[in-house]
Amino acid sequence: IVQDMALRRMNLPVELHASTQAATRTPEQALFLERCGFARVILERALSLDEIRTIRAACGVDLECFVHGAICVGYSGRCFLSRSMSERSGNRGACSQPCRLTYDLVDESGRTVVKGRHLLSVRDLNLSDRIGELIDAGITSFKIEGRLKDIGYIKNVVSYYRQRIDRALASRPGFCRSSVGELSLIHISEPT
C-alpha cells in the first residue's frame, strides 16, 4: 500500500495498492492510478455512494473504502495537524490522531465559547448498515481502521463486519468471499 508514486518506478515484484493517503476522490485520479499499474485504489473516506459509482464506471481497478473508524477532518494525505503537534506524521501512516482530542473554542476576544469538546472529530464512521449498497456501488474490499486500537476491539469489529458482509453476499449471486477462516464474536478485556 503506497502513497509515493515514485515507488512504481522501482518495478517491485508485488501488487501495488494506492493508499488512502493518495486522497483519491475523482474518476480521473482513479483512472490515472489504474493506468500507472495500481491493482487497487483505497478511496478517500468522505465519498458519497454516487461518487463511488462514478469512479467505478470510469475504471476497472479494485476499489477499497473505509467502513469503520475515525472520520478525518481533512482529506487523507493532506493533514499536517499530527506532525505539527507531535513528531508523528499522518501523511506517513503514523497519525497521532490529535483531531480526536478535546479542545476549547475561544473567540477573538479570548472568551471560551466551548470547553473540552470533540470539535474536530465529532463522530466515528460506521457503514455497517451500508455494506450492500457499497458492494452494489462497486466496492471490492472494505477497510477497518485498526491503528491505535487494542486486539479485543479489532477482533470484535472485524467479526461484526464479517457477519454483515456475509449477509450481504448471500443475497448477491456471483459474489463470494475472497478469504477463508472464521472469527468468533467474543469480547476480550485488556488487563490493566
Which role fits each region the language model picked out?
Residues 152, 156-184:
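Terminal amphipathic helices with adjacent charged low-complexity linkers/tails
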Residues 2-10:
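N-terminal cofactor/phosphate-binding cores enriched in small/glycine residues
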Residues 184-192:
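Residue-level detector of conserved catalytic or cofactor/ligand-binding positions
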